[in-house]
Amino acid sequence: DDGVEMTEEEVKRGIMDTVKNAAKDLAGQLLDKLKCKITAC
């Protein structure tokens, strides 16, 4: 086993992690924009 092959579980976990991180980034950006609208930065 050279470590290249990933099980389906590992692949799913990796995708979920990526999605979660992307969602967090997106949510942060949206929150910043909302704050700017409310407080006029």
Swiss-Prot record:
Entry's family note: Belongs to the frog skin active peptide (FSAP) family. Ranatuerin subfamily.
Disulphide bridges: 36-41
GO biological process: defense response to Gram-negative bacterium
Function: Antimicrobial peptide.
Keywords carried by this UniProt record: Amphibian defense peptide, Antibiotic, Antimicrobial, Cleavage on pair of basic residues, Disulfide bond, Secreted
Propeptide boundaries: 1-11
Lineage: Eukaryota, Metazoa, Chordata, Craniata, Vertebrata
Localization annotation: Secreted
UniProt xrefs under InterPro entries: Antimicrobial_frog_2 (IPR012521)
Provenance organism: Lithobates palustris (Pickerel frog)
Any GO CC annotation of this UniProt entry: extracellular region
Pfam family membership, one: Antimicrobial_2
Protein name, per record: Ranatuerin-2PLg
